[in-house]
UniProtKB/Swiss-Prot annotation:
This is Putative metal-dependent hydrolase BCE33L2441. Zn(2+) binds at residues 65, 156, 160. InterPro entries: DinB-like, DinB/YfiT-like, Put_metal_dep_hydrolase_YfiT. Possible metal-dependent hydrolase. Its EC number is 3.-.-.-. It comes from the Bacteria.
Length: 173
């Protein structure tokens, strides 16, 4: 049986990272607001409040989490572009998913995601090759180059979209 936590597998990539890979990943980041919107289209409130797996987040929480995560990533990129290997602040995503705003309508986060991604993608397309080598330091996972972080967040969006689409398929929604 497939691991419901990782419907598209865990994040991996071939090295070296090529310009073609970067372009593909940026396009996936650009497409995410539309893909996530399509994934939840026509779901009712009960469906939005259904966990994608036993012990997992609800569809609603997944949508809000994507925005929380990508807001953090956008800030990490800006820090890495303006400081030398900044140490970024991790956040407790599982606790964020329990905060009151995670119960808001998903449209609130979809609007935020669309606006955020417009700014983020504009920034990503402006990066020079030397910018892609810039890094940030995560206290738990260490140093990350921006090139790899682009791939990680492209995967992250597809990963959570697949949580929703695979749930819909399993439950025939």
């Amino acid at each position: 049986m497939n691991d419901l936590r990782y419907p598209i597998g865990q994040f991996t990539y071939k090295r070296p990272i090529t310009e073609e890979m970067i372009d593909t990943w940026i396009q996936e980041i650009e497409d995410l607001p539309n893909e996530l919107t399509k994934a939840i289209k026509d779901l009712d409130q009960k469906q939005l409040d259904t966990p994608y797996r036993v012990g997992g987040w609800t569809v609603r929480q997944v949508v809000h989490h994507v925005v929380d995560s990508h807001m953090n990533s956008y800030i990490r990129f800006k820090l890495a572009l303006t400081e030398k290997n900044p140490t970024i602040k991790p956040y407790k995503e599982e606790k964020w998913a329990e905060l009151p705003d995670s119960k808001l309508p998903v449209d609130v986060s979809l609007v935020m995601l669309d606006s955020l991604h417009k700014r983020w993608v504009n920034l990503l397309y402006s990066l020079e090759l030397e910018d892609l080598e810039k890094t940030f330091n995560h206290p738990d996972t260490g140093e990350t180059k921006l090139a790899a972080a682009i791939g990680l967040y492209a995967w992250h969006g597809r990963h959570h979209t697949a949580h929703i689409t695979s749930l819909r398929k399993r439950l025939n929604w």
